[in-house]
């Protein structure tokens, strides 16, 4: 596996791959990799000739009081994991290479509508940071396909709209959420949980499943969501939101909505956890 941090070297290497008509897949990450990230690499490996992963802790998507400084940097272990899953190239750019004029002066990309509400309401500017760095990486790598986990469902929808609106010729592939045996969605931030919190954390997914089952049984969404929020509070969570949205665009559900998605964000101690679950609403 090749490791590059220079933009010019990256472009030269991938130019040769495109010249040979090779299909290029991109897996953007912030590092501190777990089995969820590696599932993206595995999916890319099945589909492409050249698999490119990026490791970049993007300061533009962190808020002022968030965990940018403490976010784990585990480059050596990450590189070993990527190589063992068949990644061909890992790109590890410096911040001043991607943002040469600084964060405030850099052109930023904002995706309206789908980035508003949910995590967008609780993390102002987060999705602008995500859309900006992903646009940069799309421009530098010029992949045929890019792979994102569905655990970050709102982010996945932001990227899909970004690609559609800006006419990037890139296929966006969503990979199902990877979970621990007890149901907790895999996340780099799970490492922030204390041992006691880690034991309680699977209740987030269990609550989603309970709300899902109530909705499938015909319970009115406001009632099911209210009961879900109460259940989370009883189990020690501080919810940011628990909402039911249209799966296709995160718009509000309507009487004729069939395919919906439950989305939750909640704090357990100092750790913010997110999850989601698709639900087919009864007619």
Curated annotation (Swiss-Prot):
Q: Where does (R)-pantoate bind?
A: 61, 155
Predominantly, its location class is: cytoplasm
Q: Supply the EC number(s).
A: 6.3.2.1
Going by the UniProt record, its keywords in alphabetical order are: ATP-binding, Cytoplasm, Ligase, Nucleotide-binding, Pantothenate biosynthesis
Per the record, its GO cellular-component terms are: cytosol
Cross-referenced Pfam families:
Pantoate_ligase
Query: Which pathway is this protein assigned to?
Result: Cofactor biosynthesis; (R)-pantothenate biosynthesis; (R)-pantothenate from (R)-pantoate and beta-alanine: step 1/1
**Catalysed reaction per UniProt?**
(R)-pantoate + beta-alanine + ATP = (R)-pantothenate + AMP + diphosphate + H(+)
TM ranges: none
Top-level EC class as recorded in UniProt: ligase
Q: Where does beta-alanine bind?
A: 61
What GO molecular function annotations does the UniProt record carry, in alphabetical order?
ATP binding; pantoate-beta-alanine ligase activity
Summarize subunit and interaction data from the UniProt record for this chain. Homodimer.
Q: What else is known?
A: The reaction proceeds by a bi uni uni bi ping pong mechanism.
Q: What does it do?
A: Catalyzes the condensation of pantoate with beta-alanine in an ATP-dependent reaction via a pantoyl-adenylate intermediate.
What family does the Swiss-Prot or TrEMBL record give for this protein? Belongs to the pantothenate synthetase family.
- Put simply, this protein is called Pantothenate synthetase
Q: Which organism is it from?
A: Chromohalobacter salexigens (strain ATCC BAA-138 / DSM 3043 / CIP 106854 / NCIMB 13768 / 1H11)
């Amino acid at each position: 596996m090749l490791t590059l941090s220079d933009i010019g070297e990256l472009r030269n290497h991938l130019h040769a791959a495109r010249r040979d008509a090779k299909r290029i897949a991109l897996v953007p990450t912030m590092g501190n990799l777990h089995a969820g990230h590696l599932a993206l690499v595995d999916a890319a490996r099945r589909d492409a000739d050249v698999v490119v992963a990026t490791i970049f802790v993007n300061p533009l998507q962190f808020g002022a009081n968030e965990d940018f400084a403490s976010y784990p940097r585990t480059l050596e272990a990450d590189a070993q994991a990527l190589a063992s899953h068949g990644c061909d190239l890992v790109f590890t750019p410096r911040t001043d290479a991607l943002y040469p004029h600084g964060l405030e002066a850099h052109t930023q990309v904002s995706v309206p509508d789908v980035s508003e509400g949910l995590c967008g309401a609780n993390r102002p500017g987060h999705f602008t940071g995500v859309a900006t760095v992903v646009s940069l990486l799309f421009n530098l790598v010029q992949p045929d396909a890019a792979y994102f986990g569905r655990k970050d469902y709102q982010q996945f929808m932001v990227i899909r709209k970004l690609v559609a609106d800006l006419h990037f010729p890139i296929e966006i592939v969503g990979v199902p959420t990877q979970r621990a045996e007890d149901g907790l969605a895999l996340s780099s931030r799970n490492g922030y949980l204390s041992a006691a919190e880690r034991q309680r954390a699977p209740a987030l997914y269990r609550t989603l499943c309970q709300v899902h089952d109530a909705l499938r049984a015909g319970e009115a969404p406001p009632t099911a969501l209210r009961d879900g929020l109460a259940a989370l509070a009883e189990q020690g969570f501080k919810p940011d939101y628990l909402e039911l949205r249209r799966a296709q665009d995160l718009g509000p559900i309507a009487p004729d909505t069939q395919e919906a998605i439950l989305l939750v964000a909640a704090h357990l101690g100092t750790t913010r956890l997110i999850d989601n679950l698709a639900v087919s609403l009864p007619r």
